[in-house]
Amino acid sequence: MPVIETRVGTGAGQQEKRAAYGALIQTLRERHARVLGGGGEKLQARHRERGKIPVRERIDLLVDPLSPFLELSPLAAWELYGNEVPAAGIVTGIGVVAGTPCMIIANDATVKGGSFFHETVK
């Protein structure tokens, strides 16, 4: 098989772009980590005390083992409402259930008691 030669530059300009891109990726990862916490540790604990399963764990139990779940809008409502509505209070995505690809929509009750916002249904 022939070797594909790169056209990507290795100069200072390219290194600056790479560093800037790395910073953007880090910001994205931090935001995703914050969203995964839902309404926060206190509300997650209260949810568990009531015998309820957090939203992303419910999805993990629903989808086929070892199958991927593609979350579609984890940053919905980001920087709105003082960032108190992670993922607009809802988790949406595509997962495989019983061998069939399915659209999955699950409410996160730890975010504002499960209230819907404009961005939740947008």
Predicted regions located by residue number:
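Terminal-region recognition feature
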Residues: 1-122
